[in-house]
């Protein structure tokens, strides 16, 4: 008549704890959140490691993401299937990277992926324009957008190639004191 959870094996829970910044209680809470997204799709028993993909369209409706202008980009950055659908492992990874205790370097890596719209491993002027459009809801005129993008590249482009590589981006993030406090969501 115990109160023992039967969603995961102890080994699975230990593995999640080893690979994330979460404890057992957090993992079970994440499963509950994942289950709530698609109760007809997500099983209550993960002991046999089922592979279930919850569609991006459901994930971006979560309160933590719903109003975020980068919600699709965030989910896509953690999706292993390339379509933006998340398995439970992907879902846990997303919350782990975006939790308060994740290190700056890990967060910077995923932030870079989110802002690299054309996936060329650089943040170019076009990526910055798309970022600005989302952040300002396209309220800046074309001249203002060009000015801001040029200024960002001028200040952050350490090697002078006209675009931001990961090292440039990481250096820029290191100078942004609010990056860690804004690049997170709570479970």
Swiss-Prot record:
Pfam families: EF-hand_7. Widely expressed. Ca(2+) 1 binds at residues 116, 118, 120, 127. Signal peptide: none annotated. Ca(2+) 2 binds at residues 157, 159, 161, 163, 168. It comes from the Eukaryota. Monomer. Homodimer. Interacts with WHRN and MYO7A. Interacts with ITGA2B (via C-terminus cytoplasmic tail region); the interactions are stabilized/increased in a calcium and magnesium-dependent manner. Interacts with ITGA7 (via C-terminus cytoplasmic tail region); the interactions are stabilized/increased in a calcium and magnesium-dependent manner. Interacts with TMC1. Interacts with TMC2. It is linked to Deafness, autosomal recessive, 48: A form of non-syndromic sensorineural hearing loss. Sensorineural deafness results from damage to the neural receptors of the inner ear, the nerve pathways to the brain, or the area of the brain that receives sound information. DFNB48 patients have prelingual onset of severe to profound sensorineural hearing loss affecting all frequencies. Usher syndrome 1J: USH is a genetically heterogeneous condition characterized by the association of retinitis pigmentosa with sensorineural deafness. Age at onset and differences in auditory and vestibular function distinguish Usher syndrome type 1 (USH1), Usher syndrome type 2 (USH2) and Usher syndrome type 3 (USH3). USH1 is characterized by profound congenital sensorineural deafness, absent vestibular function and prepubertal onset of progressive retinitis pigmentosa leading to blindness. This is Calcium and integrin-binding family member 2. It comes from Homo sapiens (Human).
């Amino acid at each position: 008549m115990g109160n023992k959870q039967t969603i995961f094996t102890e080994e699975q829970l230990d593995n999640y704890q080893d690979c994330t910044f979460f404890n057992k209680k957090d993992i079970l809470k994440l499963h509950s959140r994942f289950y709530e997204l698609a109760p007809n799709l997500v099983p209550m028993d993960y002991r046999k490691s089922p592979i279930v993909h919850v569609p991006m369209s459901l994930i971006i409706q979560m309160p933590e993401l719903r109003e975020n202008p980068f919600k699709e980009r965030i989910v896509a950055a953690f999706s292993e299937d390339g379509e933006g659908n998340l398995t439970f492992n992907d879902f846990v990874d997303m919350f782990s990277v975006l939790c308060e205790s994740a290190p700056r370097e890990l967060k910077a890596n995923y932030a870079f992926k989110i802002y690299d719209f054309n996936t060329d491993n650089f943040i170019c002027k076009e990526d910055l324009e798309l970022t600005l459009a989302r952040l300002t809801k396209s309220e800046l005129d074309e001249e203002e957008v060009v000015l801001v993008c040029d200024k960002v590249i001028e200040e952050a482009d350490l090697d002078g190639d006209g675009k931001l590589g990961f090292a440039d981006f990481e250096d820029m993030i290191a100078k942004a004191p609010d990056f860690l406090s804004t690049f997170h969501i709570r479970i």
